[in-house]
């Protein structure tokens, strides 16, 4: 096994930043030194002077479009984009073709991950109105949880029968699986769309998207999800929270706030970990953009739920620091550029973001929105804790060496040439970042190094609750 020394960097882990060295032995972190490592013989030395050394990002929310939608993206291309962006693990969503709502489809997707993914992978199992009985046959050590669409979105996996919703929450609780929800009220959205078409024509301008997929639509659905989780005692993670009003569901609920410094060594043992029951995710687009950006970005930033007001965006940013938001994902959802033309009715919803999530959040660190230590908690520590990912998400002795080295004050501009996603566009094109990902290590392997990429490397399947 090769020994790699990452030296002279600022290590960020568990709420602290300190100058130090980190030793990787094979796939795992073998030592962390505050200050200089002892003299020794190493197969490779990475000089991280002036850089920050972080745990690899765990993105709890991506759509890599394979199988069935590979004209937009595939596991190979999007996991490559992830590696370029410092993302070393991902949880992929079930609205592919076929949908990941049968054991056969889930197993086939796992095989695709093993064959094609450049970084560590896992796949959510999707709920439908009538597939709850199959949950019990899942390998709970390899599935992050159950994905539940409580609102119709890309792929139309809507679960809209109350009896089915209740069975999903009950069965997930019995199996100790978290439920991650897409919360929008379809009846409210359909009513708003009809009104918008009557007023603005058959394809209302994209500026009206947040009026159609409204605050009310998000809040009512999220409120129902919280009620069901409380009724059955199910662990609930609400995806892509977009509104200040939804954040009220987490206000003054001490039991729902993420608990800091959970005992990492016992993550696999649910009985010994006081996991918060109800948590929320924010995604990059809703933290970076507001409805004012529709004027210039148009349908490139059309997504479901819709990007809301500047006030909503700022409320989400504040919630990063007070516990109401527990993880930051991307909802990375590529489409061909030709499908991103038009307005609310015609343009596809979703955008690629996995390559630029870390540098986007580091920009918010520079702006004083949050500290780099808190960013690491939201993008690595807490996804690992809440989903009970084994031996990842922290820079700790004995943990898998998923590591990213980032350099501040290193300006660069997003051009079409640097975009790795198969769709070859990004809403961030033309944007200048001040931070740069220099190296990405996945299981101790240097997969990305200052523009050089090892296309032959394959990541590992994530383990949960084991």
What do these predicted ranges mean?
Residues 9, 343, 397-463:
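C-terminal cap of metal-dependent C-N hydrolases
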Residues 112-126:
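A glycine-rich helix N-cap at a beta->alpha junction
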Residues 133-328:
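Histidine/acidic residue-rich metal-binding segments in metalloenzymes
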Residues 9, 27, 50, 61, ...:
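Divalent metal-coordination and catalytic microenvironments
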Residues 203-224, 228-233, 300, 318-328, ...:
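His/Asp/Glu-enriched, well-ordered alpha-helical/loop segment
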Residues 72-79, 129-138:
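Short, acidic/polar
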Residues 51-116:
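Metal-associated gating/positioning segment near the N- to mid-region
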Residues 1-55:
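Histidine-rich, glycine-flanked metal-binding segment
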């Amino acid at each position: 096994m090769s020994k790699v020394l990452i030296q002279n960097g600022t290590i960020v882990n568990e709420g602290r930043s300190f100058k130090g060295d980190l030793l990787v032995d094979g796939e795992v972190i073998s030592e962390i030194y505050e200050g200089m490592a002892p003299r020794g013989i190493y197969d490779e030395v990475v000089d991280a002077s002036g850089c920050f050394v972080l745990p690899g990002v765990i993105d709890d929310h991506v759509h890599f479009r394979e199988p069935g939608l590979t004209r937009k993206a595939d596991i190979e291309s999007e996991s490559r984009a992830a590696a370029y962006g410092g993302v070393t693990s991902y949880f992929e969503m079930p609205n592919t073709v076929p949908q990941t709502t049968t054991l056969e489809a889930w197993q086939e997707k796992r095989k695709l991950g093993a064959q094609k993914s450049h970084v560590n992978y896992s796949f959510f199992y999707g709920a439908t109105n009538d597939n709850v009985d199959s949950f019990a046959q899942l390998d709970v050590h390899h599935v992050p949880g159950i994905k539940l669409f409580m609102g119709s979105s890309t792929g139309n996996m809507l679960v809209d029968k109350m009896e089915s919703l209740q069975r999903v929450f009950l069965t997930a609780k019995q199996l100790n699986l978290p439920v991650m929800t897409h919360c929008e009220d379809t009846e409210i959205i359909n009513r708003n769309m009809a009104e918008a078409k009557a007023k603005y024509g058959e394809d209302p301008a994209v500026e009206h998207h947040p009026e159609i997929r409204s605050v009310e639509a998000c809040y009512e659905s999220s409120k129902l999800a919280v009620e069901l989780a409380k009724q059955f005692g199910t662990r609930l993670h609400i995806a892509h929270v977009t509104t200040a009003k939804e954040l009220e569901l987490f206000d003054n609920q001490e039991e729902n706030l993420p608990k800091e410094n959970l005992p990492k060594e016992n993550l696999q043992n649910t009985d010994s970990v006081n996991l918060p029951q109800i948590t929320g995710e924010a995604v990059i687009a809703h933290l970076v953009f507001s409805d004012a950006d529709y004027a210039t970005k148009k349908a490139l930033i059309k997504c479901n739920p819709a990007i809301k007001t500047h006030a909503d965006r700022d409320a989400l940013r504040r919630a990063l620091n007070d516990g109401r938001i527990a993880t930051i994902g991307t909802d990375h959802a590529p489409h061909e550029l030709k499908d991103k033309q038009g307005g609310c009715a015609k343009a596809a919803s979703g955008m690629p973001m996995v390559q630029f999530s870390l540098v986007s959040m580091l920009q918010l660190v520079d702006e004083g929105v949050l500290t780099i230590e808190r960013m690491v908690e939201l993008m690595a520590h807490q996804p690992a804790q809440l989903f009970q990912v084994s031996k990842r998400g922290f820079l700790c002795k004995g943990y898998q060496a998923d590591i990213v080295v980032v350099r501040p004050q290193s300006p660069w501009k997003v051009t079409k040439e640097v975009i790795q996603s198969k769709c070859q566009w990004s809403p961030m094109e033309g944007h200048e970042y001040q931070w740069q990902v220099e190296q990405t290590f996945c299981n101790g392997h240097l997969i990305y190094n200052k523009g050089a990429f090892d296309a032959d490397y394959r990541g590992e399947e994530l383990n949960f609750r084991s």
